[in-house]
């Protein structure tokens, strides 16, 4: 099952145990593999939630403002105000986000079948964290979240099962350009197999890093304690 198919079940669980603030749709321009038996999926769901209704959370709306569609690029004046002023041409994004999927020829492409675009994760990181905060991604893939977090002055904790993706992570986060005497370079080949026998936790910032290899059960135990 895909993330889109799982979401109804996850939504019910999260709604019963947490406080859902927003249900976001990431809309993209291609469904990838074309099916002749059903409609192709052109979106992925995202839940924004807190532990409970009393939880304090960060929402930096000023850091994620986008251009408001006014129908014209000229300066518009709002005469409804006591002192006429230019219309605000910026607005907070709604809950439907349009970002293209990562394609093979893009500079940010890494060898992963479901890589998320940096622009998508940057919006989430900027909105929900402040500088020097720690951003956790327990299913890191190519470590785009961690990479974006560090670029924007945050620290990052990334967790990943696959050794090859882990190598991508330590390269993208700037921890090292080598791994066990292997020089790490971007691989521009097509998608890899998404499996591994071990978990790796990486804690990284600009000045320090910790790397731990863990068994799957222990990794999940840590996740449960974190959340």
Name the predicted role of every residue range.
Residues 1-168, 214, 219, 223:
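Core catalytic lobe of class I
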């Amino acid at each position: 099952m895909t993330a889109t198919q799982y979401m109804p079940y996850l939504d019910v669980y999260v709604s019963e145990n947490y406080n859902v603030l927003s249900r976001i749709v990431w809309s993209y321009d291609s469904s990838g593999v074309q099916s002749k038996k059903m409609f192709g999926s052109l979106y992925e769901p995202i839940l924004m939630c807190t532990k409970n209704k009393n939880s304090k959370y960060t929402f930096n709306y000023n850091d994620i403002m986008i251009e408001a569609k006014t129908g014209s690029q000229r300066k518009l004046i709002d005469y409804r105000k006591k002192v006429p002023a230019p219309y605000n041409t910026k607005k907070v994004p709604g809950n439907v986000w349009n970002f293209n999927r990562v394609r093979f020829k893009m500079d940010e492409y890494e060898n992963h079948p479901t890589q998320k675009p940096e622009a998508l994760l940057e919006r989430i990181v900027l909105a929900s964290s402040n500088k020097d905060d720690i951003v956790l991604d327990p299913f890191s893939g190519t470590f785009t979240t961690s990479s974006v977090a560090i670029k924007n002055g945050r620290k990052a904790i990334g967790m990943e099962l696959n050794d090859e993706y882990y190598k991508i992570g330590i390269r993208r986060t700037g921890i090292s350009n080598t791994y066990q005497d292997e020089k790490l370079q971007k691989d521009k080949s097509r998608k890899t197999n998404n499996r591994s026998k071990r978990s790796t936790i990486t804690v990284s910032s600009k000045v320090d890093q910790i790397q731990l290899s863990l068994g799957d059960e222990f990794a999940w135990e840590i996740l449960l304690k974190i959340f």
